[in-house]
Every structure is written in structure tokens, then in C-alpha cells.
């Protein structure tokens, strides 16, 4: 039966290991199928040509600079035989989709590394439905040691020539994430793929809130000079410093956890970048871009950032994006008050969203889902509008403004027109990313992109409790959640939220379980509680951090 024909395109880049492939590796993945690009193939320079058994067919295999192509070797048949022509159709995989190569051997129980050579196994990244990626294998069977050695070395050389894929990763793992399942997720699903790709790893367990911040702000990552360090890595990076230069000294950073962990690590990397640039971290108008790319493995009870980045909260997909070196530049916000930086972040909610999180934090002994549901119900029962003054700078997409922003000009110093609204607001959301999640499959801000240089300002004015609940329920449906008379949306570059309540937050004497400290207002910033007593100024900074992942169409060209 002929294979199903489909072309799988996944952008990629990088390296592998010389370990042997397991003998049970799959023969031919059904997704590696035929391509009609004969003219392109003819134009490519051929590196190697040989005969391998693929599936059950002996094939003429050609390795070019861009792809591996094969065609079954068949006896001559009369021209025009459609079944014969179909069987002899050329198939291919692009080299950029390969992330590892191994020698395939048949080993007995007592044998560890030696055994009868069977051929070569290629490990490939394929695109599935709904933004998912999967790893697959292709076996090239040939019993000749010399023949396989030549091909194996050529594949290794090709993989080593992909510079954007990480060679070493600093793993920050939050063992408390999602019912303490993050550790199991990493060691059972993530680490085997990283080892297969030949990526060195160093794992640090995040033992307390703020651990990642203190670690990444101070440590020298290239030496892994902290807890759980491996001395050989320091030698490895010292050698790289001599022969490859500073740009390859530091490994990429990967966070295994939920939104709280991911936001903390991103904040730490950005603070580290400002410190390295000699900037005053308390007052930052034009922050510099983080030097180290960040990978996010979704392993928390909420994975909004990873879900928005990858389009799906899928561990294997996130891991393969890291291995293949798929990088996205993502917009980041700064949150400041009275001119002092509070933190970097991607999204924030004030009002109902902030109070709900503050309530949930008081019941951490509950399971994450129970805590969230309980907090939502209680916040709805005590629904209260905040008297606010909101100023914002509308997004200007003109070329001259974008050029000025790219050069680092503070937007507040430009001759732009601020707008102001005031009144009673149930909720205020400011989001630089779509904020996809299980309760909002289309996103809390579905019209926002990861790096379009703007934020979504979503305001819910005071209304009845039933109407506000209808608005919340719309997030889980396909209907427009903003199609209510009390909901307003704006596309902005900067926002200032100034609460005008004199009491500030909740009155401690009014209820025993107040949701904020006295004279402070609760903010939900990337799932973390931030309590502020005065005006908060949110600025957007385009493409400030590099994250592994993103849709195929939005990835940075290699």
C-alpha cells in the first residue's frame, strides 16, 4: 500500500550525539512523505548517494545540502503504469527537521554499546495538528560499517552546523508546581529528549519564592557555579571561551513550572541584562534586551505564558521548540510606581482579577482548581467596583513612530496624545500577549500578538452581577466576550491606573479575610500577587526577551 502523501514543514537548526539508536526505533514514520519539488532537488549540491533499506524497500538515497531524498529501486516496468509510478515516487525530509542521528545496532542483553550494526537512525521533528510537534524516527538500514560510518559522520557534520540550537541548558525546576508533578514531567518527558539531542543540562531545584531571581541575578551561568553544579562544565565553558568567543559562553535557561515560575525567571533574566548593561534597575525607561533565550516547559496549574507562546500547553511541543532552536522575540511590560520599577511582566489585572488572586493566595492549602473556583465565587459574591482614573497612550503603528521606538526613545517624551477615562470599574486588564488558557481557549486578549508592539487594554465598567458573570462566561465560548455595553477595549502603548479610593484596598475592619494589605490594591501580574498603594504605570517594550517557541509562521528566520 502506498504511503499517505503529506509534507511536514517545521523550522529547525542544530546538533546530535554519537550514541547508538535503540534497535526498536520505528521504521518509517507515516508523516514523512512525498514531495513534488524535483526542480529544487536538481539544483541542490549532492553530498552523498547510496543504497539503504527504508521500510521494506531498497532505496536509492541522496543526501544534498538541504534534504535527504529517497526513491524505491524497482525493476523496469512499462511507462504509464500508474501503480508503479506511485510506488516509485520520490520522498524526502528536510535536514533542518533532523535533531539527532545514531548508529542503530542489535545488542544482546549482556552487550551495552557494541553489537551488530543495522544502519543509521535519524530523529526528526514533525508538525502535528493544533500547533503540536512530535518526534519521530527514520531508519536507514545498511550492514556495511564503512558505508554507515561515512553517512553518520556527514550527518553529524551537518547537525553541528546549525548554530542557533542550544548546546547546554540551565534547568530551573519548581517541584511544587501543579500537585508537585513538575519533577516527574521533566525527568520522564523532557530530559530523555534533551539527552537524545545531545544537549548538556544542569538542574537547579527552585526551593523558595524568589530563588530563581536571586540565582540568575548573581550567578555566572557559564560555570554553573552554584548549588548542584558539575565542575566539568566550568572546564567546558572555559574551552569554549578560548575558541568560540563570548557569544556562546552562557547556556540557555529553561523553566519547568507554571506561570509564577515562568514570570519570575523572565523577570530575573531581564534584571540581569540591565545589570550587565550598567543600568540602574530601580528606574528604567528603555531597558536592554535579555541576552539569554528562555525556554518554558508547561508544568503548572496555569500555563498562560507557555500556552500563548506555543499555541498549546504541550510538554513535548515545548521541548522540541527548545531543541530545534525555534526562537520568538516577545514584547514585555514594565510595571512601575512613583518612577520606581516594580517588575517586568506580560499581563496584569486590576479589580476583580486582582482580588480573585489575592483571595486564592489565602487558601493555598486547597488544590489549585478548588482554590481558583472558591476565589472566583467569593469575589463574585463580594463584587465591588473601583473608582479609578485611567490614562493611556493609544498605539501608533506609523513607520516614523515605530522607528523612534526601535531606537529606544521613551514614548512619554514624544508628542503623543494621552487619553483619559474615569469612573467605577469592575476589572481592568492590560495584556501584551493573547493569554491563552483552558478557561479562555481564544485568549483573554485574542486580538493581541506576542510581538506586535502593542498592549490590549480591556475595561469592564460597573454593572450588575448577572451581566458581569455573562461577560466572564463568554471567555469559554466562541462568542465575542467584549460585545457588552459596559466593556471597552483599546490598543495601547502605555497605561497609567490611578485608584481614587481613599481607603485603598479592603478595610481590615470590614471583613476578616481582606484580600490586600491595608492601604494597598491587589494586582494580578502573570499570576503573581502584587500589592501597590498608588498609581501603577505600565509601559510596553517591544521584543525585549527571546523565548523558545511560537507558531511556525511567526518564528524568526534562520
Curated annotation (Swiss-Prot):
Disulfide-bond pairs as recorded: none
Highest taxon listed in the record's lineage: Eukaryota
InterPro entries xref list: ATP-NAD_kinase_N (IPR017438), CERK_C (IPR045363), Diacylglycerol_kinase_cat_dom (IPR001206), Lipid_Phosphate_FormReg (IPR050187), NAD/diacylglycerol_kinase_sf (IPR016064)
Span(s) of short sequence motif Nuclear localization signal 2: 102-106
Annotated stretches, region: Disordered: 1-36
Keyword Endoplasmic reticulum: yes
Disease in which the protein is involved: Retinitis pigmentosa 26: A retinal dystrophy belonging to the group of pigmentary retinopathies. Retinitis pigmentosa is characterized by retinal pigment deposits visible on fundus examination and primary loss of rod photoreceptor cells followed by secondary loss of cone photoreceptors. Patients typically have night vision blindness and loss of midperipheral visual field. As their condition progresses, they lose their far peripheral visual field and eventually central vision as well.
Domain DAGKc span(s) in chain numbering: 164-339
The protein's name: Ceramide kinase-like protein
This protein's UniProt keywords: Cytoplasm, Disease variant, Endoplasmic reticulum, Golgi apparatus, Nucleus, Phosphoprotein, Retinitis pigmentosa
Annotated GO biological process: negative regulation of apoptotic process; sphingolipid biosynthetic process
Amino acid at each position: 500500500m502506498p504511503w499517505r502523501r503529506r509534507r511536514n514543514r517545521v523550522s529547525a537548526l542544530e546538533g546530535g550525539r554519537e550514541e547508538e539508536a535503540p534497535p526498536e526505533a520505528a521504521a518509517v514514520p507515516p508523516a514523512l512523505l512525498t514531495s513534488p519539488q524535483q526542480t529544487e532537488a536538481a539544483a541542490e549540491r549532492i553530498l552523498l548517494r547510496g543504497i539503504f533499506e527504508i521500510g521494506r524497500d531498497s532505496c536509492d538515497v541522496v543526501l544534498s545540502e538541504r534534504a535527504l531524498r529517497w526513491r524505491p529501486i524497482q525493476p523496469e516496468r512499462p511507462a504509464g503504469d500508474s501503480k508503479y509510478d506511485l510506488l516509485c515516487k520520490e520522498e524526502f525530509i528536510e535536514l533542518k527537521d533532523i535533531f539527532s542521528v545514531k548508529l542503530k545496532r542489535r545488542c544482546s542483553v549482556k552487550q551495552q554499546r557494541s553489537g551488530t550494526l543495522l544502519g543509521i537512525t535519524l530523529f526528526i521533528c514533525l508538525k502535528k495538528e493544533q500547533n503540536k510537534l512530535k518526534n519521530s524516527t527514520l531508519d536507514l538500514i545498511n550492514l556495511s560499517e564503512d558505508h554507515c560510518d561515512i553517512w553518520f559522520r556527514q550527518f553529524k557534520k551537518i547537525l553541528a552546523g546549525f548554530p542557533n540550537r542550544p548546546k547546554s541548558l540551565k534547568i530551573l525546576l519548581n517541584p511544587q508546581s501543579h500537585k508537585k508533578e513538575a519533577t516527574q514531567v521533566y525527568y520522564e518527558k523532557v530530559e530523555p529528549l534533551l539527552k537524545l539531542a545531545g544537549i548538556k543540562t544542569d538542574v537547579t531545584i527552585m526551593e523558595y519564592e524568589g530563588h530563581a531571581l536571586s540565582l540568575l541575578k548573581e550567578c555566572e551561568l557559564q560555570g554553573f557555579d552554584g548549588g548542584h553544579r558539575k565542575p566539568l562544565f566550568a572546564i567546558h565553558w572555559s574551552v569554549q571561551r578560548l575558541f568560540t568567543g563570548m557569544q556562546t559562553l552562557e547556556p540557555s535557561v529553561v523553566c519547568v513550572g507554571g506561570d509564577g515560575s515562568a514570570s519570575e525567571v523572565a523577570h530575573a533574566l531581564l534584571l540581569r541584562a540591565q545589570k550587565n548593561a550598567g543600568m540602574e534597575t530601580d528606574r528604567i525607561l528603555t531597558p536592554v534586551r535579555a541576552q539569554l533565550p528562555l525556554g518554558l516547559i508547561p508544568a503548572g496549574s496555569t500555563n498562560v505564558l507557555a500556552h500563548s507562546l506555543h499555541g498549546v500547553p504541550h510538554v513535548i511541543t515545548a521541548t522540541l521548540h527548545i531543541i530545534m532552536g525555534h526562537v520568538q522575540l516577545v514584547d514585555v511590560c514594565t510595571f512601575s510606581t512613583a518612577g520606581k520599577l516594580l517588575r517586568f511582566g506580560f499581563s496584569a489585572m486590576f479589580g476583580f482579577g486582582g482580588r480573585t488572586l489575592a483571595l486564592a493566595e489565602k487558601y493555598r492549602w486547597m488544590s489549585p482548581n478548588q482554590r481558583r473556583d472558591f476565589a472566583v465565587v467569593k469575589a463574585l459574591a463580594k463584587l465591588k467596583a473601583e473608582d479609578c482614573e485611567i490614562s493611556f497612550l493609544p498605539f501608533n503603528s506609523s513607520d516614523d513612530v515605530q522607528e523612534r521606538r526601535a531606537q529606544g526613545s521613551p514614548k512619554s517624551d514624544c508628542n503623543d496624545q494621552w487619553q483619559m477615562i474615569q469612573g467605577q470599574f469592575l476589572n481592568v486588564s492590560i495584556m501584551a500577549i493573547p493569554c491563552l488558557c483552558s478557561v479562555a481557549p481564544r485568549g483573554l486578549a485574542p486580538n493581541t500578538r506576542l510581538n506586535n508592539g502593542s498592549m490590549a487594554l480591556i475595561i469592564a465598567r460597573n454593572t450588575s452581577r448577572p451581566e458581569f458573570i455573562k461577560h466572564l462566561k463568554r471567555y469559554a465560548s466562541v462568542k465575542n466576550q467584549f460585545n457588552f455595553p459596559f466593556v471597552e477595549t483599546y490598543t495601547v502603548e502605555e497605561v497609567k491606573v490611578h485608584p481614587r479610593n481613599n481607603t485603598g484596598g479592603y478595610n481590615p475592619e470590614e471583613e476578616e479575610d481582606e484580600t490586600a494589605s491595608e492601604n494597598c490594591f491587589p494586582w494580578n501580574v502573570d499570576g503573581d500577587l502584587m500589592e501597590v498603594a498608588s498609581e501603577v504605570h505600565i509601559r510596553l517594550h517591544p521584543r525585549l526577551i527571546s523565548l523558545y517557541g511560537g507558531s511556525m509562521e511567526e518564528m524568526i528566520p534562520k
